[in-house]
């Protein structure tokens, strides 16, 4: 097959005939640039030698190829003659086993899929659901409370709350949001809750709970009157100021603490400066009064008199005014 294609190529045939006629033929012999390059020249020489060897070995390759093709054709004809009578009997006997083999292959394929699925299931992370241990204890406590309440008949522990009504109103609001007025065709659709006379109109229970609330308020008012008497005003004021300072020191923010501390320092410095200026003014006034002879140094209040509680500053100022007149 390939030999025919090779023989049909005219350019290759011309090249082969030319190379056979001219055994000393060197490609690119007239190209001086290629001939001056040593590497290219060596490669060309090797190529020429390999080509000559192939040309010499071509008859052997052709004979081998022809022998192989003849042997294959002979073997095929012999096999066809031998296998013709056996194919009919073998096909009938092989149909059933082949079907079984196909079924086995399909089964094995499905088993491999199931095995892959099992591996994936094994490697999947599973959530571990743990039982809440507090449920049993809380249920037992609630059950005991319920039994005690039923035995005593005292339902005062159950306090009425507005939580159920809030839930009902919230659900109704969610139903009404985003709907037009035309949606509500009947006034009954706007009813949030209907009063039940047996439950909501229980006046006895309402009056009993009202009395309990009023008694609790009276007790609270009495304790407040005893604790916060007008006579103990100063005491409570000190306690209040102490608590205020404690709360202010405890409840501070770390970010603004330094700034607030600096503000306090500047405030006290300003107050100290004002006090020093007032003291200096006071000293200047006293010095001028003494220099003018209005009062003498002996008449000034001493440190002992200033520390005493019975010193009457207003009286001293009046005496100074009288002396000045």
UniProtKB/Swiss-Prot annotation:
Q: Which UniProt keywords apply?
A: Coiled coil
Look up the coiled coil feature and give its residue ranges. 38-69, 201-229
Q: Record keywords: Coiled coil included? A: yes
What name appears for this protein in its UniProt entry? Uncharacterized protein L265
Species of origin: Acanthamoeba polyphaga mimivirus
């Amino acid at each position: 097959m390939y030999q025919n294609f090779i023989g049909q190529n005219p350019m290759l045939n011309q090249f082969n005939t030319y190379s056979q006629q001219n055994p000393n033929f060197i490609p690119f012999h007239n190209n001086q640039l290629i001939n001056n390059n040593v590497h290219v020249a060596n490669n060309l020489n090797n190529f020429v030698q390999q080509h000559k060897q192939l040309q010499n070995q071509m008859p052997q390759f052709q004979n081998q190829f022809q022998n192989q093709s003849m042997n294959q054709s002979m073997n095929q004809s012999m096999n066809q003659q031998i296998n013709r009578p056996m194919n009919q009997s073998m096909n009938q006997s092989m149909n059933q086993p082949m079907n079984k083999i196909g079924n086995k292959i399909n089964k094995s394929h499905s088993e491999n899929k199931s095995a892959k699925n099992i591996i994936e299931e094994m490697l999947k992370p599973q959530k571990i659901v743990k039982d809440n241990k507090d449920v049993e204890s809380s249920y037992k406590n609630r059950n005991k409370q319920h039994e005690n309440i039923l035995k005593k008949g005292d339902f005062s522990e159950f306090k009425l709350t507005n939580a159920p009504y809030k839930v009902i109103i919230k659900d109704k609001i969610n139903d009404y949001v985003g709907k037009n007025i035309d949606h509500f065709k009947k006034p009954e659709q706007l009813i949030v809750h209907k009063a039940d006379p047996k439950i909501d109109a229980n006046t006895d229970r309402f009056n009993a709970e009202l009395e309990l609330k009023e008694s609790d308020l009276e007790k609270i008012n009495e304790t407040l009157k005893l604790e916060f008497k007008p006579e103990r005003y100063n005491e409570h004021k000190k306690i209040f100021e102490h608590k205020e300072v404690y709360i202010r020191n405890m409840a501070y923010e770390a970010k603004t603490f330094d700034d607030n501390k600096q503000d306090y320092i500047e405030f006290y410095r300003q107050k100290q400066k004002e006090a020093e200026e007032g003291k200096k003014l006071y000293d200047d006034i006293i010095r001028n009064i003494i220099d003018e002879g209005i009062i003498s140094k002996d008449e000034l209040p001493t440190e002992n008199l200033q520390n005493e509680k019975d010193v009457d500053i207003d009286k001293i100022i009046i005496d100074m005014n009288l002396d000045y007149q």
